[in-house]
């Protein structure tokens, strides 16, 4: 043990064991107010938000009594989000439709942007642009936002009585119930991040090896799985909110 401790201390002193300094790929940073900001994520997230806001403006700008094809599409998306929210949350789903819808649409468009938008055209001093959900910072932020939402939902309905769920059905399960609230955002964030990162890496490798026909089916499969991941994230977020309001597992 003494030898092992000495070896670890030596590595730390020499700077070879600094886990916080390990990075995957190259990153481009901005310095804002003394903070180091991940510029790639901000740029791609702003593009996705602009696409969503532009689509929303087009959807509500001139509604017709006899809906057009575009209006039908947006109404279908809204009904789909309402159905997901109602199924998972229950009768009090109404106030949560905007939140669940925002999560679903942001993740869906972010995932698809990695395959459909020509990010490579934009040249950066370091690194390159990719889907926002390809970065662990984005998925962790979305997962933490979901955690805040279901804590707020439970506390707003039950007050401090919400915390009684941690000792149900028996106080022996208190550590497990507390641990569950930590594993929820972890599972949400790493599932989304891992799937999107793996999908983009597979496409990049196949394009470099066989740049003609073979990558195309994989890209279509990636689009499908990207949509499924957005649905899974939104459905689980709604389920957690419904669970916190109902108080069952």
UniProtKB/Swiss-Prot annotation:
PROSITE patterns referenced in this protein's UniProt entry, alphabetically: ATPASE_A
Cited SUPFAM superfamilies: F1F0 ATP synthase subunit A (SSF81336)
Ranges in a coiled coil: none
Keywords on record: ATP synthesis, CF(0), Chloroplast, Hydrogen ion transport, Ion transport, Membrane, Plastid, Thylakoid, Transmembrane, Transmembrane helix, Transport
Entries under Gene3D superfamilies matching the protein: ATP synthase, F0 complex, subunit A
Membrane topology: Multi-pass membrane protein
Main location: plastid
TM helices/strands, residue ranges: 40-60, 97-117, 136-156, 201-221, 222-242
GO CC, any one term: plasma membrane
NCBIfam families hit by this protein: ATP_synt_6_or_A (TIGR01131)
Function, in words: Key component of the proton channel; it plays a direct role in the translocation of protons across the membrane.
Subunit structure of this chain's protein: F-type ATPases have 2 components, CF(1) - the catalytic core - and CF(0) - the membrane proton channel. CF(1) has five subunits: alpha(3), beta(3), gamma(1), delta(1), epsilon(1). CF(0) has four main subunits: a, b, b' and c.
Protein name: ATP synthase subunit a, chloroplastic
Origin species: Draba nemorosa
Lineage, top ranks: Eukaryota, Viridiplantae, Streptophyta, Embryophyta, Tracheophyta
